């Protein structure tokens, strides 16, 4: 995945432009779970807001799995002053509303990621600049590209286990970081 990110970097540099997300302070990282991200590290990087994906990042698409320790991690981050915003491309509006209310996080649905409009709207509602916001999601083609286009840093988490869609069977290994097969959700961390 880092190789694909560097290809986009090289492409923009060949055009003589540098996308806003490639500034010194911005970064791209891959982790297994949401809870494995250190809140203190984000704060040291100047992060004050998190744009969070819902489907297969926080909750599996079929609602069977919740990211291990995800709710606790969000509550801890909120107590430390970090703002959250959910952007979801999911088709089930009531599901997005349910999780938005349960986690007490505002949401935009449908976000039409990777287009940057919803990312900019979320940043405006949090009253933060792109260098103060990080995008956390599981999909390269929506979350990582959306972060790149909107000028934000990004952390890609492993996709929670879910029934694969037809296109994921064909392209999944290029757009998602798979959840480790040798690990169970409750064994992580």
What is the predicted role of each segment?
Residues 2-52, 59-64, 68-87, 91-135, ...:
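Asp-based, Mg2+/Mn2+-dependent phosphohydrolase catalytic module
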